[in-house]
Amino acid sequence: MKKHKKYICNNCDKTGHDSKSCPDPVTSWGIILVKFDNLGHLNIAHDKNTKLTNITEVKLEDALDINKASILIDRIQFLLISRKHSLGFIEFMMGRYSLMNMDHLSFLIRQMLPTEIKNIRDNINNFDKLWSGLWGKHHARYNNEYHNSKKLFEKINDVRSVDITLEFLLDNIVPSPIYKNPEYGFPKGRKNKGERGKECAIREFQEESGFDIEDIKIIEEVEPIIENLTGTNGIRYRHIYYLAELVSDKEIPLIKTEHQIYEIGSVNFYTFNDTQHHIRPYHIEKKNIVTKLFFYYMEKLMNLGKT
């Protein structure tokens, strides 16, 4: 009797389908790391099953609280990483556009950095150089996308295939890029086969930030934080983050691994205001998460030492 293969989805962990046909949002796992700058090692107590959805404000009862809050406001810092390449550039290089929809292609180009647009112009007839510059030695894992994207790239540069070539689009139609700086976010990524969510979050955090698991304390009492969004490609995404605190005196590691060199632009801690500035305006839910975490820790620090 022929046995039917039992599928276990690596995206949602449910049975009956694989990740390519999963109806759930494309899910990534990561860690939001909080640092208390110049406050020493704090022993902050957390209530079990804490949900950030219940946090909406910081209560300031008197002038002493206001003064304390003004001191603490820049002491709570969040670890952000910037990607080496913009999402617009990656989507373009992966061939996630249609020659029948120039408006969407123009939108992707506007999301790119000026340096990326210049790179395309300089290599308008050399897709392979653009591809290897994007993925380095990891290009083999994207072989399927490579062949499809290269065909699209060659077509959009061929006047016999399209009315508007990529070169003409770059030089005459697409307005200036919207952003001059890369996109910032938290360390995260998708699970490897057979990997659990928390394992994935820790691995991605270590690979992207350079910190080790011994440098941080994952706050188990706070429930994982969920960010839902829809990409410019119409695909639904879900980012699930564990909250963690920095417990070592380790400086921010230098970007030196092969993974970091090709994927990460920078790693740094930022104050609440700077974090809000670096996160792009359309990431409203991410900004709200940072705000709730800031309120949460302000309340915790304000109450330290109070009876």
Where are the regions that the model predicts?
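A short, cysteine/histidine-rich metal-binding "knuckle" motif
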Residues: 1-27
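Unchanged
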Residues: 87-99, 103-111, 116, 120-123, ...
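Intrinsically disordered, low-complexity domain-flanking/linker segments in eukaryotic proteins
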Residues: 39-71, 108-109, 150-172
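Short beta->alpha transition motifs characteristic of CBS
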Residues: 83-85
